[in-house]
From Swiss-Prot:
Family: Belongs to the CRISP family. Venom allergen 5-like subfamily.
Localization annotation: Secreted
Predominant cellular place of this UniProt entry's protein: secreted
Tissue expression summary: Expressed by the venom gland.
Gene3D superfamilies: CAP
Coiled coil: none
Presence of keyword Hydrolase: no
Pfam families: CAP (PF00188)
Protein name: Venom allergen 5
Domain of life: Eukaryota
Keyword vocabulary terms for this entry: Allergen, Disulfide bond, Secreted
Domain named SCP: residues: 46-190
Disulfide bonds: 4-17, 8-102, 27-95, 171-188
Species per Swiss-Prot/TrEMBL record: Vespula squamosa
Length: 205
């Protein structure tokens, strides 16, 4: 794929064009401990997503503002996509916290969740806890109004996590030391993107 030719819905130069297709870290003088998602981490990320999607779909999520969350009838089971993961890793490997603009593939308009955790103790936060922080945003979600009427910065990771029409996920991760802060940065890309237009998070049962 020539990523320099991909025109993203949100515009901008594609991450895999701008930074090249290497996933090697490009973090200036920060000390990189490791980068990439291990097989175990990949399975954990997928399991947390699918268990949670299943829980919400079955109407078993009692949290919310107000709760509970209504059940869903069209929730896809997520599968891992290596291309999404690769593009997520290229971005994570820049050690720049934030969303990259253009990360679409020829197959998908791509959505994204990011998380970072830093500690002065020489330990790196477990990937599962980073993902669960997105899940916990459900506590602020009001299902009686549309997701667009909710306060996006409080619920946007949750809505992408359970966006029914999303089919595939791929994540990248990097662990580095920045001024004695032991930092774990996780980027997950989703296709097709959630939090999109005037669509609903999921169809209610």
């Amino acid at each position: 794929v020539d990523y320099c030719k991909i025109k993203c819905l949100k515009g901008g130069v594609h991450t895999a064009c701008k930074y090249g297709t290497s996933t090697k870290p490009n973090c200036g003088n920060m000390v990189v401990k490791s980068y990439g998602v291990t097989q175990a981490e990949k399975q954990e990320i997928l399991k947390i997503h699918n268990d949670f999607r299943n829980k919400v779909a079955r109407g078993l999520e009692t949290r919310g503002n107000p709760g509970p969350q209504p059940p869903a009838k069209n929730m896809n089971n997520l599968v891992w996509n290596n291309e999404l993961a690769n593009i997520a890793q290229i971005w994570a490997s820049q050690c720049k916290y934030g969303h990259d603009t253009c990360k679409d593939t020829t197959k998908y308009n791509v959505g994204q969740n990011i998380a970072v955790s830093s500690s002065t103790a020489a330990v790196y936060e477990n990937v599962g806890n980073l993902v669960k922080a997105w899940e916990n945003e459900v506590k602020d979600f009001n299902p009686t109004i549309s997701w667009e009427q909710n306060e996006f910065k409080k619920i946007g990771h949750y809505t992408q996590m359970v966006w029914a029409k999303t089919k595939e996920i791929g994540c990248g991760s990097i662990k580095y030391v920045d001024n004695n802060w032991y930092t774990h940065y996780l980027v997950c890309n989703y296709g097709p993107a959630g939090n999109f237009g005037n669509q609903e998070v999921y169809e209610r049962k």
